[in-house]
A protein has these predicted regions:
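Juxtamembrane/interface motifs at transmembrane-helix termini
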Residues: 43-47, 55-57, 70-71, 98-100
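Conserved GNAT-fold acetyl-CoA-binding loop/helix
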Residues: 32-54, 65
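Acyl-donor (CoA/ACP) binding surface of acyl/acetyltransferases
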Residues: 1-36, 66, 70-172
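Short loop/turn motifs at secondary-structure junctions and domain boundaries
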Residues: 58-62
């Protein structure tokens, strides 16, 4: 049974570890998930391992990551949602979310994002959060606006080679 450090009504938040390659492959091996994350739209096995190691490294250094999230009723991997340090801005983090396709449209994105925002502002005392999305990812745009993020223009995102609509959410 997986241990969770944070829960919502339906979601358990855990931490990635080196034994999670199979789970990472379930998520980042799905082209519907990765098509908005990188320029090729597909993660190789090496890309998946690199991504998993990046998340583990972020946890080791900062005690945060894009945490693996699980459906509490089934313990099935939904995807990941969390935060990472954002550039050199003090006390500012980037919110990120990747969900397996079978969990799209069920409210998990909003539920998980709200928990990550609450954690950022109340536990970490973040001043603000940054978020961006692929220009063609309309669902992410709708989610960020629903969560209260404000548009700040577009920022270049090297993994896709595109300028991504970008947003900030201030901690009031």
């Amino acid at each position: 049974m997986r241990e969770y450090f944070m829960k919502t009504m339906r979601i358990g938040f855990s931490n990635w570890n080196a034994a999670d390659m199979d789970l990472a492959a379930q998520l980042w091996g799905e082209s519907d998930v990765t098509r908005f994350i990188c320029s090729t739209g597909i993660f190789t096995e090496e890309d998946i391992m690199d991504r998993l190691n990046t998340e583990i490294h972020n946890h080791d250094l900062y005690q945060i990551q894009y945490w693996p999230i699980f459906e509490l009723s089934t313990e099935e991997l939904i995807g990941c949602c969390g935060i990472r340090p954002f550039q050199s801005q003090p006390n500012c983090y980037e919110l990120g979310l990747h969900l397996r396709k079978k969990f799209w449209g069920l409210g998990y994105a909003s539920e998980a994002s709200k928990a990550a925002i609450d954690y950022s502002f109340h536990i970490l005392k973040a001043n603000k959060l940054f978020a961006g999305h692929h220009p063609q990812n309309n669902a992410s745009e709708k989610l960020l606006l629903k969560l209260g993020f404000q548009s700040i223009g577009k920022k270049y995102y090297a993994p896709t080679g595109l300028y991504h609509p970008s947003y900030e959410l201030e901690n009031h």
